Amino acid sequence: MELALYLLPVTLGDTPIETVLPPYNKEIILGIHHFIVEDVRSARRFLKKVDKGIDIDALTFYTLNKHTSPEDISGYLKPLVEGHPMGVISEAGCPAVADPGADVVAIAQRKNLRVVPLVGPSSIILSVMGSGFNGQSFAFHGYLPIEPAERAKKLKMLEQRVYNEHQTQLFIETPYRNNKMIEDILHNCRPQTKLCIAANITCEGEYIKTKTVREWQGKTPDLSKILCIFLLYK
């Protein structure tokens, strides 16, 4: 296999590997012994899911999350510089997209090291695909403010971008606060604004539905403790 930093997508939940990841990914994974991961425990679990016979103890893991210092991140690429292929694994979905993995990819690019993204599920892309919204211009904002007044202000700002820039707006919430997020959207956005709720993407019980804010009133699903993305458009 080629010497490179491989970006290795992960399933979005308990989805069987074969339904969302091509066999080529497994071939690449089995040839790597150095992994940069967001969470070691979930990475080990994913690798065992890819191949039960994989020798986890023979692998080296480097933790990359929001607490990792820039100095540590730069040092993580030493095996790659020395001639060993490396892999980047997020907790879910595609690494380096709304994910700390982007930091190590940026360093690899600066060092002129080969970077190879592999095919796999992205909740951001899949939710845009399933929403019926503008897929040529969209923005993902991560988590919105928790404080009510700030959240209301942010929602109105995102909604304004929908109408001014014709741009799809995406954001997420901690699962146990999903229902409150829906309440806030319905309270602060215009009746004609469209809201897509995309939950459990690629998993059992997948739910992707688009309606206007007016149509959602009094008819929202219970999304507590479910991974979900919210999308706004017109």
Question: Predicted segment positions?
Answer:
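Acidic beta-strand-to-loop metal/phosphate-binding motif
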Residues: 36-37, 87-93, 168-173
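Glycine-rich, flexible N-terminal cofactor/catalytic loop recognition
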Residues: 1-64
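A contiguous loop/helix-start segment that scaffolds small-molecule binding in enzyme catalytic cores
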Residues: 2-6, 84-85, 163-234
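Conserved helicase motor
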Residues: 62-69, 144-148
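Short active-site oxyanion
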Residues: 29-35, 112-116, 168-169
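Glycine/small-residue-rich loop that forms an oxyanion/phosphate-binding "nest" at active or ligand-binding sites
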Residues: 65, 73-115
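Class I SAM-dependent methyltransferase SAM-binding "motif I" and its flanking Rossmann-like core
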Residues: 6, 103-161
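Short glycine-rich anion-binding loops that position phosphate/pyrophosphate groups of nucleotides
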Residues: 12-14, 91-95, 175-176
